[in-house]
Amino acid sequence: MVQPYKHEPFTDFTVDANRQAFLAALEKVEAELGREYPLIIGGERVMTEDKITSVNPANKAEVIGRVAKANKELAERAMKTADEAFRTWSRTSPEARADILFRAAAIVRRRKHEFSAWLVKEAGKPWREADADTAEAIDFMEYYGRQMLKLKDGIPVESRPGETNRFFYIPLGVGVVISPWNFPFAIMAGTTVAALVTGNTVLLKPASATPVVAYKFAEVLEEAGLPAGVLNYIPGSGAEVGDYLVEHPRTRFISFTGSRDVGIRIYERAAKVQPGQIWLKRVIAEMGGKDAIVVDKEADLELAAQSIVASAFGFSGQKCSACSRAIIVEDVYDQVLNRVVELTKQLNVGDPAEQATFMGPVIDQGAYNKIMEYIEIGKQEGRLMTGGEGDDSKGFFIQPTVFADVDPNARIMQEEIFGPVVAFAKARDFDHALEIANNTQYGLTGAVISRNRANLEKARHEFHVGNLYFNRGCTGAIVGYQPFGGFNMSGTDSKAGGPDYLILHMQAKTVSEMF
């Protein structure tokens, strides 16, 4: 009997035993740094001369691992393997597939701190952020396993006398999962197991900045009983391997999480029907945001300030849900702005391996350079209140940065920065604040801080985002509780961790029998 779903609790690091366990996990991971990792194709380990070098963003001299790098030939081999494995895996019972997810979740739960320690080292996540990432990975496995069991017999439809009608779901085929570096365990695992539990086979191309944790997860799935060839681990260049697989005539669907520009490129390339292709490919995409917290004059101003700071600067603002715009009605603008600046100045920036660190590095040199360029733009477009400095001598550290008095159409109010930068804009009233909030090509998350029920109800209908929060920050969606995905250029509104997500990986079949 499968127990009802509940999300994995976060670790309380005020408990000394938990602290000691996490420190021990960090020591274990540090002892394994610098190893080489192969591709996994059909269960076989394939080493390549060309490697992807994963480094610690807090200490770029520290190599996390050197990972084999797939090319087109190896990608083709993986595709043939996955295509062949689909014949048997697609006929494996939903119960058996779900059981593999439950076993994998149990394995990760037993090694929870170890996986979180890999996230500290490879992604630069502070303890709490790493712990939440691992918990979310467990949640995806537990939730999607249960969702597949709910869907396994289809959905009831009507039948007339002398007729029996059945409506049920079957797998699609080979899926290409292109996962991001910012949630390198949770989103990588979630998108992978959603495709697997629905009976598809997977080619997993993890982000080049964080391939080691993906390899560790592939090992977990093997240990949990996933047959060889059902998941093939093939990190590689997006321009070479990514494009090749997106365009491949045997690819049935692509599950992508990443930037708007790459998402658009994938969508365009997947739309073209290749010679020999006998279906229209499906694209499941989550492509970022320009998320806003709106504060009205009747808000709890301390809650507003704390929500903005936590949402803007958690994991250095490297979340597609991060608050990069704070839209405050003019009556309370100065109070909220000044309190946010006070709180921001208190934040601890440093090595994520230290428990006291609130904010670690950004992911790599490219991200560092881009964010620092946006900070220079911000100095022209707004008033720098705090932050603005960076140091990439050892790692990629940027101070949390607040700009005030920014025009709603300014670049730092319109373009996704993906770093620890928040821009403040002043609104005349609540209606104007919503107008500013919706003035973006994205529509992922948003929050409203208000005690005014009429304003909250107005926002419920008019604030055009996929995930809207009242009287809390705009990050931290929980699997099964707040299904996650956005509108417009934030993607295909595929609600990860929601009741209709698995259906995106299947196709419906109707069978009607007369008797």
Curated annotation (Swiss-Prot):
Q: What positions does UniProt annotate as the active site of this protein?
A: E286, C320
Q: Which GO terms describe its cellular component?
A: cytoplasmic side of plasma membrane
Enumerate the Gene Ontology biological process terms: glutamate biosynthetic process; proline catabolic process to glutamate
Instruction: State the signal peptide span.
Output: none
Q: What is this protein called?
A: 1-pyrroline-5-carboxylate dehydrogenase
Show the InterPro entries listed in the entry.
Ald_DH/histidinol_DH, Ald_DH_C, Ald_DH_CS_CYS, Ald_DH_CS_GLU, Ald_DH_N, Aldehyde_DH_dom, Proline_metab_enzyme, RocA
Q: Which HAMAP family match?
A: RocA
Its pathway is: Amino-acid degradation; L-proline degradation into L-glutamate; L-glutamate from L-proline: step 2/2
Q: Does the keyword NAD apply?
A: yes
Read off the Pfam families from this record. Answer: Aldedh
Organism superkingdom: Bacteria
EC number annotated for this UniProt entry: 1.2.1.88
Disulfide-bonded cysteine pairs: these are none
Its UniProt entry gives the catalysed reaction(s) as: L-glutamate 5-semialdehyde + NAD(+) + H2O = L-glutamate + NADH + 2 H(+)
Key words of the record? NAD, Oxidoreductase
User: In which family does this protein belong, per the annotation?
Assistant: Belongs to the aldehyde dehydrogenase family. RocA subfamily.
NCBIfam families tied to this protein: D1pyr5carbox2 (TIGR01237), PRK03137.1 (NF002852)
Kindly indicate whether the keyword NADP belongs to this entry: no
Recall the GO molecular function terms of this protein's record.
Answer: 1-pyrroline-5-carboxylate dehydrogenase activity
Top enzyme class, one word, equals oxidoreductase
